[in-house]
């Protein structure tokens, strides 16, 4: 089964909220279209970046439908407490023309049971056999999918074509050594912004699900291009990729923490996107010090454009990180 939908840059879409704290579907679609127009290969919706625990199942599926009808290639997240609900999201994804599944482990109930997780994964994969899927591995879920479980599932479900790793460098290295290097058709995805270089250069990752890419798509796409060239042995690209990784570091670290959605929505507002001013829980907000910190870090990353309200002017500094 074709796994190319999981390659390249793939932002995990955030769900914009209206002033009454309901989903702004028009804003969601616009952001998805803008990111694809910028060069992203696909988008993920609805994952943790999309605030899936704060949305109803109907709201999540309405967002998926709106994106697919607008021609945005969507990888659908199956996060749910109940396996039946996860299966319903997978079935809906296939029905409306989504391009792939990001299969999330069973949560809260029997989450540490390998047998329960095996049954959970199998139910989702069998619900949408026409969609290529990756298993999402993350320490936040309290369960680690190892090679034995992955290949037990792959032997039964040909639509399981890859592995997304949100853990750190060691977890990515394990996935490369024991899972995705077994078969060249399997795709490894870097699931956190801080591990993109390690994932691409040292582990053979071919895709990155990104948070900061929602805010700085051109810069992140260039970073991915450099990482890909570095993985092919280009020393100049390797040096430029490391420089850009360091410049992006703090903005990327936001992707690792519990306030990632608050930070990236705030960065979008600073960059002029008013669709992201509101949150679903009115009490969800960054502290004053967090906001100032985010402002300072964005300014630091944008040496050629000190004002907020517009993206970084790359053309005024053509040698910056190897940009042409």
Q: Which ranges hold each PLM region?
A:
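Short glycine-rich loop/turn motifs that provide flexible caps or phosphate-binding loops at active sites
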Residues: 7, 46-49, 76-78, 161, ...
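Catalytic alpha/beta core domains of metabolic enzymes, predominantly
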Residues: 123-128, 138-257
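Active-site beta->alpha loop and helix N-cap motifs at the rims of alpha/beta catalytic domains
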Residues: 2-144
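A broad structural signal for alpha-helix termini and local helix breaks/kinks
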Residues: 71, 128, 157, 271-272
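Structured C-terminal cap/extension of enzyme domains
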Residues: 198-324
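A general structural signal for well-ordered alpha-helical segments in protein cores
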Residues: 28, 60, 64, 86, ...
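Short alpha-helix boundary/capping motifs
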Residues: 63-64, 71, 95-96, 121-122, ...
